[in-house]
Swiss-Prot record:
Record InterPro entries: 3hydroanth_dOase (IPR010329), RmlC-like_jellyroll (IPR014710), RmlC_Cupin_sf (IPR011051)
Protein name as it appears in the record: 3-hydroxyanthranilate 3,4-dioxygenase
Gene Ontology molecular-function annotations: 3-hydroxyanthranilate 3,4-dioxygenase activity; ferrous iron binding
Pathway: Cofactor biosynthesis; NAD(+) biosynthesis; quinolinate from L-kynurenine: step 3/3
CDD domains the UniProt entry points to: cupin_HAO
Organism, scientific name: Saccharomyces cerevisiae (strain ATCC 204508 / S288c) (Baker's yeast)
Superkingdom, natural source: Eukaryota
Binding site for Fe cation: H49, E55, H97
Residue numbers bearing the Phosphoserine modification: S176
Pfam family membership, one: 3-HAO
Note: Present with 2330 molecules/cell in log phase SD medium.
Catalyzed chemical reaction(s): 3-hydroxyanthranilate + O2 = (2Z,4Z)-2-amino-3-carboxymuconate 6-semialdehyde
Binding annotation for O2: R45
Keywords of the record: Cytoplasm, Dioxygenase, Iron, Metal-binding, Nucleus, Oxidoreductase, Phosphoprotein, Pyridine nucleotide biosynthesis
Length: 177
């Protein structure tokens, strides 16, 4: 039997806000065809997710910043997209993106289940020269845990974090200046 119980988002947030923890801060509400996630802020990550399918963002509380890389030209362009409270945004598939969520913010993200044989990637760009430092490829089976595992793997490996081009040591989490 399929699920017949609606979820009251406001009530769920009051009862479960402790589940939205760094570095990803997400909780999967629904799975099956699509994954519906509640995502809180602040988050602590520098990697860019590359999803082979589109992602839909809805900002329920506060604003967020979606950092994207436009790779349609020979020279990639790093672009910041502000998604304000009440806004929705549909990100096309295969666009590198890094959601920046601020304190006391809440969003909803909907991702389509991946077609067979299509993998997600988590990519880190050098903070100094913007070249690709490391990329992890994974068959996305559990959004609630796999992104976090990729972040921790990068964070714990200095070799993966060191830029081949300029030798800058990069980090999995933003560093205060």
């Amino acid at each position: 039997m399929f699920n017949t119980t609606p979820i009251n988002i406001d009530k769920w947030l009051k009862e479960n806000e402790g589940l939205l923890k760094p570095p990803v801060n997400n909780y999967c509400l629904h799975k099956g065809g699509f994954t519906v996630m509640i995502v809180g802020g602040p988050n602590e990550r520098t990697g860019y997710h590359i999803n082979p399918t589109p992602e839909w963002f809805y900002q329920k509380k506060g604003s967020m910043l979606l950092k994207v890389v436009d790779e349609t030209d020979a020279e990639p362009k790093f672009i910041d997209i502000i998604i304000n409270e009440g806004d929705s945004y549909l990100l096309p598939g295969n666009v590198p993106h890094s959601p920046v969520r601020f304190a006391d913010t809440v969003g909803i993200v909907v991702e389509q289940d991946r077609p067979g044989g299509e993998n997600d990637k988590i990519r880190w760009y050098c903070s100094h020269c913007r070249q690709v430092v490391h990329e992890s490829e994974l068959q996305m089976l559990d959004l609630g845990t796999q992104v976090k595992e990729a972040i921790l793997d990068f964070e714990n490996d200095v070799e993966k974090r060191t830029c081949f081009h300029c030798k800058t040591l990069n980090y999995a989490r933003p560093q205060s200046n």
